[in-house]
Amino acid sequence: MNTRRLLLMTLLLLGAAGCAALRPSTGVERGAAPSGPGDVADGSGWWYARFFIERPAGEPPRWYIGTLIGGEVIAPVFDRHYQDILIWRVHRRAGNDDYGHVFSFIFYSTAAGAQRIYADLEKNPVLQRLRKEGRVTKVGFDDPSRITRPRIEDTSDRHWSLSVQQTWPALAMGASRMWLDLVGEVADKHADEQDLEQRYIEVQQDVNDIWAKQGQHAVLHHISGIFAYQPLLITY
């Protein structure tokens, strides 16, 4: 097995649990954002919208639920509130622990912008349906009355150098934008499927196939090129 193939397989293994070992930064989890303007802090910072996804014991993660949330909940809210968002990304994790399977929308905004986004998410009919059916067991929002992550590096991995912590969010946003647009493109091809959950099962399968066949060149190769094709140390 050549070195390039070994590195690719290692990357796939590292991603299998969706950052299972790394819990996202914690904030105050709320069922809904406060509605009064007096409750909102001044300034900007990072905000999380966390969607806790049902995972029956002994079953693998239902990754397509996160993809459904991305396509039907996050995308329309983002389109309506892009002016409130400086930088953003999505995050997944599905560890076999108490925290469980969580899909997160993470964005840098003013507290007032976060309040508007949270209020819009709460009203999303697809999210309401997922919660009613038990597919999403809980939604967690941060408290817009206080800003706990004001710096651009505040949601990056503390094990990284400060320069990487400060610049990595741009890479994560680009990858998240590519993924979200890809989900939208693929979902349009399955528009004839009336059952929403089945549609996104098919979307997830198609996205998996695209990633498996094209991710090495479209993503890994070109990122490697940006960094001058230098050796990469991978540890696990």
Where do the language-model regions lie?
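An acidic, charge-biased composition feature
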Residues: 16-236
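N-terminal export leaders
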Residues: 4-9
